[in-house]
Amino acid sequence: MLARCLVSCGLSLAAITTLAFAQSPSPNGVVTLNPRGAISTGTDTWSVGARAGDFIFVAGMQGVDPATNKLVEGDEARIRQAFLNLKLIAESAGATLQDCVRLTVYVSDLHRFAPLVSKVQAELWGKPPYPPRTMFEVQRLFDDDIVEIDSIFYAPTKK
């Protein structure tokens, strides 16, 4: 009896856990993305991404370590983590970095961080072609971070 109860409770817990991560599409089919392993949005009013038809939109990603939800140390490491965060979200919806059609990069110091952004992006993408990219210097980013990158991917649901 105890074993049956444990199995039943375990299955119920698994179903609840699955439901917590399932995202219902909007009336027009937009599905929000909050994949396992991504940074936590907590109880805030945003998702890390959304799929709308064949396009995947990833929210501005910072160099936050998903395991701790804290900014990683070091400029290059933080920029790399921002790219890795957007990569994870895109991959959760079936895209690769090569499917990126738009990058918008915000940095707190253009002269200091633009070369690092280019270096890390080249390492992660490998070789051209690279997606269109616009980089802005901004006065301040959330948590006084140095970089935030938002992105759009094209990944047809039917190939």
Model-based region annotation:
Residues L2-L84, L88-A93, Q98-V101, V107-K159:
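N-terminal presequence-like segments and the immediate start of the first folded domain
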